[in-house]
Design a protein with these regions (language model features):
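Conserved ABC transporter NBD signature motif
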Residues: 57-65, 74
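Conserved ABC ATPase signature
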Residues: 132-136, 140
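Helix-to-loop junction immediately C-terminal to a conserved catalytic motif
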Residues: 49
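The feature captures the beta-strand-to-loop junction immediately N-terminal to the Walker
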Residues: 34-36
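Conserved ABC ATPase "signature" region
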Residues: 110-128
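A short, flexible loop at the N-terminus of ABC-type nucleotide-binding domains that lies
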Residues: 1-4, 8-20, 68-70, 109
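Catalytic Walker B motif of ABC-type/P-loop ATPase nucleotide-binding domains
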Residues: 157-160
């Protein structure tokens, strides 16, 4: 379960990106946050994964508060696909980019290869594993980023863009 209590965040003293935001997402529940450009949707996503820290309020995963001390533990439970998937590509090909998170979690190579093929296939990118990310369309990049997150089998997946679905 995710619980957000009275969250505030500002990029400047005059301009609140978020003010007094509270919500709860139970296990197996989906939450969609909709709004105009600049309404704080990406800010909420970044707060939920600990990229930004709340200036007021709190975020809990089950009974664990997201803090500097717990952020690494919680990040292992949460995956995010950003609005611009280019920010998630680190390698020379699609296969490497799907594998990146798995390598960080020390998944054995034999298991990693199976997961790469399984999730690339699930998103229709199995024929693109050796392609360079910069040669892909925006939608293909989204699918590669989603495959990488799904392969991690996280408890929570945050899609910071309507077209990430």
């Amino acid at each position: 379960m995710i619980r957000v209590n009275d969250l505030d965040y500002s990029y400047s003293q005059q301009d609140h990106a978020l003010k007094g935001i509270s919500f709860e997402v139970k296990d197996q529940e989906w939450l969609s946050i909709l709004g105009h450009n600049g309404s704080g949707k990406s800010t909420i996503s970044k707060l939920l994964v600990g990229i930004l820290a709340p200036q007021k309020g709190s975020i809990y995963y089950d009974d664990i508060e997201l803090t500097e001390k717990t952020v690494d533990k919680i990040r292992n439970r949460v995956g995010i696909v950003f609005q611009n998937p280019d920010n998630q590509f680190v390698g020379v090909n699609v296969k490497y980019d799907i594998a990146f998170g798995l390598e960080n979690r020390c998944v054995p190579r034999s298991e990693m290869q199976k997961l790469i093929v399984e999730y690339a296939t699930k998103v229709g990118m199995q024929d693109y594993l050796l392609r360079e990310p910069q040669t892909l369309s925006g939608g293909q990049k989204q699918r590669v980023a989603i495959a990488g997150i799904l392969a991690l089998n996280t408890d929570v997946i945050i899609l910071d863009e309507a077209t990430s679905m």
